């Protein structure tokens, strides 16, 4: 598989290089040179998740990684289901929270960990990543205990749920966590500064586990095929998929799936009050506002890193950006959506509720609606309990970590302090 740097097309790398390197020159994102449609999508949709995913990724990776190795990586990473649940209103929820950290990022995080371990040379690797909630847990658990790989996770202090924090800040070992005095965009800015520091990159073998890493993105392509595989065959080509969107890696993966031949009609980018993209699609003006804290904190992103990949893919395929559905919901609307979902006997959390609400608003009569449920409701127990007057029980993984002490250190949003921490 060959990939190029969107900012500097002359920089071309293999899949293994892209996984190890994370970003290209000038903070450029890597993107596949070829996205040839799959030969027989209908036959693929009849296969089990792991077998189908291995074939999709083998198609993408080509001769670089033997098919048997791809299958091995997938079978080690995808050890949990992604069920499609039909609601009373006729829409479908794709539940992506059945992995070890109860969030959709288990798919990408675990596949990336397997890839990095497989492609690792004898050099030390330091994974530096920022999280607005779910990435931290998925990455921490995927890499915990892997030899020769150290993980450093930045997160905005006081701006993720206590249970999210407990899931990745209690492990220790090769997982180090830093609570940054700032918002998620400040955390991402620190990560970008680190990747601009060539001496630092070389000294600690810097890599990223955010959705800017191509391995995470390609793994996420697979669950879009799983969603469509579980739909009635007559409904597939009419499917509209609503995607909770923060850093826009999830939507990018869906569009790649469509480019590979997945029979879906269109997508909806669902955001909270941090609505840079919906406003951009309406006005053509890219105007990020100051990030605001919301109930759906994993989407509290005003400067989504993956948006250039969306634009690049649409440019290459000749897809007009205007055909991409989008919209935002504020906290009051999110609360109302959670209550209406509960009246349908479906327990959700804020991110999924936003996707469902916008799906209902934008779905035509002849279309079939699917929305992504990206996290288990218990990961947002405080807000879900308060809004719905419930006491959501904690699943095993959350209950276990809820009792452990936090191991994070606190740092200001200053690169000099972060650099000293990394090399110290």
Predicted regions and their residues:
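PLP-dependent amino-acid enzyme catalytic core
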Residues: 1-424
């Amino acid at each position: 598989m060959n990939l190029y740097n969107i900012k500097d097309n002359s920089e071309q790398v293999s899949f293994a290089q892209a996984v190890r390197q994370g970003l290209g020159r000038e903070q450029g994102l890597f993107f596949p040179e070829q996205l040839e449609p799959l030969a027989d999508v209908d036959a693929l949709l009849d296969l089990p998740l792991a077998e189908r995913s291995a074939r999709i990724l083998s198609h993408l990776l080509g001769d670089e990684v033997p098919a048997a190795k791809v299958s091995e990586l997938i079978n080690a990473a995808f050890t949990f289901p992604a069920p499609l649940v039909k609601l009373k209103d006729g829409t479908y929820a794709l539940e992506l929270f059945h992995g070890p950290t109860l969030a959709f990022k288990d798919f990408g995080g675990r596949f990336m960990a397997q890839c990095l371990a497989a492609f690792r040379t004898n050099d030390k690797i330091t994974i530096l990543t920022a999280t607005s909630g779910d990435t931290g847990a998925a990455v921490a658990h995927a890499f915990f205990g892997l030899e020769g790989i150290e993980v450093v996770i930045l997160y905005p202090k006081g701006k993720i749920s206590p249970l999210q924090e407990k899931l990745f800040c209690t492990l220790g070992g090769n997982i180090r966590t830093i609570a940054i005095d700032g918002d998620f965009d400040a955390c991402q800015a620190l990560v970008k500064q680190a990747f601009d520091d060539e001496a630092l990159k070389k000294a600690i073998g810097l890599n990223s586990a955010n959705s800017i890493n191509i391995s995470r993105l390609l793994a996420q392509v697979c669950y879009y095929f799983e969603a469509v595989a579980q739909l009635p065959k007559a409904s597939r080509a009419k499917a509209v998929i609503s995607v909770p969107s923060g850093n826009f890696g999830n939507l990018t993966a869906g569009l790649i799936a469509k480019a590979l031949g997945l029979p879906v009609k269109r997508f909806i980018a669902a955001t909270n009050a941090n609505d840079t993209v919906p406003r951009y699609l309406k006005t053509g003006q890219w105007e990020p506002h100051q990030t605001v804290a919301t109930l759906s904190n994993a989407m509290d992103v005003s400067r989504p890193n993956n948006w250039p990949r969306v634009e690049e893919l649409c440019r290459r395929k000749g897809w007009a950006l205007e055909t991409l559905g989008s919209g935002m919901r504020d906290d009051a609307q999110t609360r109302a959506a959670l209550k209406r979902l509960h009246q349908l006997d479906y327990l959700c959390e804020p991110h999924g509720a936003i996707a469902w609400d916008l799906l209902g608003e934008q779905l035509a009569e002849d279309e079939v609606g699917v929305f992504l449920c990206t996290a288990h409701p218990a990961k947002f127990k405080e807000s879900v309990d308060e809004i719905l007057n419930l006491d959501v029980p904690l699943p095993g993984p959350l209950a276990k970590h809820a009792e452990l002490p936090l191991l994070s250190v606190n740092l200001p949003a200053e690169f000099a302090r972060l650099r000293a921490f990394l090399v110290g």
